[in-house]
Amino acid sequence: MALNLQDKQAIVAEVNEAAKGALSAVIADSRGVTVDKMTELRKAAREAGVSMRVVRNTLLRRAVEGTEFECLTDTFTGPTLIAFSNEHPGAAARLFKDFAKANDKFEIKGAAFEGKIQDIDFLATLPTYEEAIARLMGTMKEAAAGKLVRTFAALRDKLQEAA
């Protein structure tokens, strides 16, 4: 279906707005993936706070101009599916990586975070805010418990020396 100039401008503006508000972006090729599987992916993306769209490469190049995802322009070849993470930087990467494991024909082309091309595994393994807080609290709790044990051990040793 041919798009007129106004439609193209609207697509570029919409993708540009999504890119400006996004934390990270992931590019993939979905050739060969069934419509049912893509529908499942889109549903999972909505639930994860990820906006996904298939966009023509020329329009996508214009849309990401001047954004931190301009570094991805070399990956805009063939059918391009772009996903922007809006709530957590690793959300789109984690979603695409899990989907690629289950679907051999789904190919991840690249990912960007903070203006640089990143490894998909790096982004997919980033902890969420809640996970990071839990890790921090675990580390703090572990340090406090260790200090308490060492204090009691020192007190025990001191009492044994006095006796």
From Swiss-Prot:
GO terms for molecular function: large ribosomal subunit rRNA binding; structural constituent of ribosome. Keywords: Ribonucleoprotein, Ribosomal protein, RNA-binding, rRNA-binding. The keyword Transcription regulation does not apply. One of its GO terms (cellular component) is large ribosomal subunit. It comes from the Bacteria. InterPro entries: Ribosomal_uL10, Ribosomal_uL10-like_sf, Ribosomal_uL10_bac, Ribosomal_uL10_bac_type, Ribosomal_uL10_CS_bac. It holds the Pfam family Ribosomal_L10. The keyword Cytoplasm does not apply. GO terms for biological process: translation. Gene3D superfamilies: 3.30.70.1730, 6.10.250.2350. Coiled coil: none annotated. PROSITE patterns: RIBOSOMAL_L10. Part of the ribosomal stalk of the 50S ribosomal subunit. The N-terminus interacts with L11 and the large rRNA to form the base of the stalk. The C-terminus forms an elongated spine to which L12 dimers bind in a sequential fashion forming a multimeric L10(L12)X complex. Belongs to the universal ribosomal protein uL10 family. Forms part of the ribosomal stalk, playing a central role in the interaction of the ribosome with GTP-bound translation factors. This is Large ribosomal subunit protein uL10. It comes from Actinobacillus succinogenes (strain ATCC 55618 / DSM 22257 / CCUG 43843 / 130Z).
